[in-house]
């Protein structure tokens, strides 16, 4: 399975994502730069975490307006799988590929620790290797991960099963409404989440709870 990783100034988790995708798929992903207007034929596009363009204006606001994001949107519209992690999630929201907004953590502090995630919807390409209600571990590292959506949008997300990851009870690190940690679009091929599953894919790194997400997204057989 082929994958691509989007590179933008200020992103600093690209090597983590590249290493994870290489380890899981057996093939190094291609990389696409901010000015690229086309993305090769791939099965998965990943937007990693970091601080694109220094998080000026709003987290992800400048990155979302780069030429490469128009190419990402075109691929997503054709059904290509897209995943945005941390700043990648913020970029997807700013680009209009996912609804809602990501605000400053309620603590007003940068949060970096391991948390527990509940699989809210296991009937997606990203979560099909997990069990409904399963609780997994994942690192978080962000300052603006407080997910918010208006009442109508929130009701639609909850009602249509678009909330796929939720911070397990008592572990919400940022104040996200309804403990939301990750959502998908209506078509089910675009995922955004604040935690970093790419940092927990093998035992040598403390566990492999995040591995199944990428295996599912890449369509790797169990």
UniProtKB/Swiss-Prot annotation:
Glutamine amidotransferase type-1 domain: residues covered: 3-222
Keywords: ATP-binding, Cytoplasm, Glutamine amidotransferase, Hydrolase, Ligase, Nucleotide-binding, Purine biosynthesis
GO MF: ATP binding; glutaminase activity; phosphoribosylformylglycinamidine synthase activity
Pathway: Purine metabolism; IMP biosynthesis via de novo pathway; 5-amino-1-(5-phospho-D-ribosyl)imidazole from N(2)-formyl-N(1)-(5-phospho-D-ribosyl)glycinamide: step 1/2
Record's keyword annotation contains DNA repair: no
Domain of life: Bacteria
Subcellular location as annotated: Cytoplasm
Residues annotated as the enzyme's active site: 86 (nucleophile), 196, 198
BP terms from Gene Ontology: 'de novo' IMP biosynthetic process
Record EC number: 6.3.5.3, 3.5.1.2
First-listed, main subcellular location of the protein, grouped into a coarse class: cytoplasm
Keyword Nucleus set for record: no
Chemical reaction(s) catalysed: N(2)-formyl-N(1)-(5-phospho-beta-D-ribosyl)glycinamide + L-glutamine + ATP + H2O = 2-formamido-N(1)-(5-O-phospho-beta-D-ribosyl)acetamidine + L-glutamate + ADP + phosphate + H(+); L-glutamine + H2O = L-glutamate + NH4(+)
One of the record's GO cellular component terms: cytoplasm
Purpose of the protein: Part of the phosphoribosylformylglycinamidine synthase complex involved in the purines biosynthetic pathway. Catalyzes the ATP-dependent conversion of formylglycinamide ribonucleotide (FGAR) and glutamine to yield formylglycinamidine ribonucleotide (FGAM) and glutamate. The FGAM synthase complex is composed of three subunits. PurQ produces an ammonia molecule by converting glutamine to glutamate. PurL transfers the ammonia molecule to FGAR to form FGAM in an ATP-dependent manner.
Subunit structure: Part of the FGAM synthase complex composed of 1 PurL, 1 PurQ and 2 PurS subunits.
Protein name, per record: Phosphoribosylformylglycinamidine synthase subunit PurQ
Lineage of the species this protein comes from: Bacteria, Pseudomonadati, Pseudomonadota, Alphaproteobacteria, Hyphomicrobiales
Designated gene of the protein: purQ
């Amino acid at each position: 399975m082929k994958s691509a990783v989007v590179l933008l100034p200020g992103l600093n988790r690209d090597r983590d994502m590249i290493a994870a995708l290489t380890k899981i798929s057996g093939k190094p992903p291609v990389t696409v730069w901010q000015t690229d207007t086309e993305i090769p034929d791939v099965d998965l596009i990943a937007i990693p975490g970091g601080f694109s363009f220094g998080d000026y204006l709003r987290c992800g606001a400048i990155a979302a307006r780069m030429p490469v994001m128009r190419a990402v949107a075109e691929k997503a519209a054709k059904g290509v799988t897209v995943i945005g992690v941390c700043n990648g999630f913020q970029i997807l929201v700013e680009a209009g590929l996912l609804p809602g907004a990501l605000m400053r953590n309620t603590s007003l502090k940068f949060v970096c620790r391991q948390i527990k995630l509940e699989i809210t919807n296991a009937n997606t390409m990203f979560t099909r290797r997990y069990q409904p209600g399963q609780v997994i571990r994942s690192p978080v590292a962000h300052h603006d991960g407080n997910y918010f959506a208006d009442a109508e949008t929130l009701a639609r997300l909850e009602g249509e099963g678009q909330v796929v990851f939720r911070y397990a009870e008592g572990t919400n690190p940022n104040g996200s409404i309804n403990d939301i940690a990750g959502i998908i679009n209506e078509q089910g091929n675009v995922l955004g989440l604040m935690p970093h599953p790419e940092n927990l894919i093998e035992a040598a790194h403390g566990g492999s709870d995040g591995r199944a997400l990428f295996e599912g997204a890449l369509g790797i057989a169990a």
